[in-house]
Amino acid sequence: MRAVSQTSPNRLAEALSSPHMLKEMLDLFGHEYLPVFEGEIKPHGPLGTSDSRAKRPLNAFMAFRTYYLKLFPDTQQKNASGFLTQLWGGDPHRNKWALIAKVYSFLRDQLGKGPVNLSAFLGIACPLMNMVEPSIYIEVLGWEQTAPQGIVTFQQNTDIMKANLARLFNVHPTTEIDLLTSILSAGYFTDFSQVLLMRMWACQNGIMTTTSATAGNNVATTQPLYESVPTTAEKVSFINAVRESRNLAAHDLFGPEYDAAFFGNRFVHSWEVQDLTSFQNVQISVADSPMESNTLYNFRMPSQCLPQVSEFDLYDVIDTSIIDISSAWSIDQYLHEKQSKMQQQCKYFLFRNSDCS
């Protein structure tokens, strides 16, 4: 520290303009060095936007989803989201994605959402973290696309994945400040590099990741990612009640009219699994639109009010959406949408024919 204090201001400023040099200085003399800049290193100081409150941290899956969405350029958004959820279930680098998401959240809170575009940030951070490029992701991770009965799914061969990942170069930053330093050293946010590094160092909330090719979810943190939820006797009692009988628990919570038959008639399905990564290739029926429940469905509706569609084609539904065929309202909704689409097509062809004539 004495040597630093005796260094000329110009020489010191030149040295500290290097993010790597500044990080080394902070690691050595941070506790003595930072108080000089106390007014600048507050977590949400002059760099912040007009709304200086910290926003919700970016979810690791959302970072993954944004980076690999380009895998399905010609796929409908809802289908692409389903595919990416399945790929996420077999991704071995969730700890690295958590690290990337934390650094993005930090920069967004410091500089504002405008200057820190997520897609642009991932284009910088992911190569620095040696994430698998989208163009080779499916092949490297051992995924194979199948389409039984027209339903596209992915199957993963973990042996192929491990062999492929073992051949890849896997040196990467292992803490938040390491990744931030690498980003700043690459020439991004240079006008704010010093104060950004000092603020992150002062926060002391870095995530440690392992360098294993298949590190999985192993994330060691200097402090918890999320604050723990306090446990109360009431919570413990209710959780135990749900474990013993979820129907009785709902009955006690909502009232006597909410019994097993009530929930059963509403086509609300649930699955209990030990690990979400093993919950794959399951078609989950979505909830009905907010309207009268199926138990109140009017089965005596006049025939002229029903959709005039000749038949219900199951294979038409596969690429459209997932519906519950035990729900009368869901069937009618699908048939009505099909009828409307057919009418629009007829109008279009009539319009074209009239122009041709």
UniProtKB/Swiss-Prot annotation:
Q: Name one GO cellular component term.
A: nucleus
Where can this protein be found? Nucleus
Q: Which family does it belong to?
A: Belongs to the MATALPHA1 family.
Could you confirm whether the keyword Signal appears in this record? no
One Gene Ontology term from the biological process aspect of the record: positive regulation of mating-type specific transcription, DNA-templated
- Main location as per UniProt: nucleus
Q: What does this protein do?
A: Mating type proteins are sequence specific DNA-binding proteins that act as master switches in fungal differentiation by controlling gene expression in a cell type-specific fashion. Transcriptional activator that induces the transcription of alpha-specific genes.
Q: From what organism does this protein derive?
A: Fusarium oxysporum
Q: What is the lineage of its organism?
A: Eukaryota, Fungi, Dikarya, Ascomycota, Pezizomycotina
Portion annotated as DNA-binding: 53-108
Q: Which UniProt keywords apply?
A: DNA-binding, Nucleus, Transcription, Transcription regulation
The record, for PROSITE patterns, names:
ALPHA_BOX
Highest taxon of source: Eukaryota
Keyword Cytoplasm recorded = no
Q: In its UniProt entry, what is this protein called?
A: Mating-type protein MAT-1
Q: Which GO terms describe its molecular function?
A: DNA binding, bending
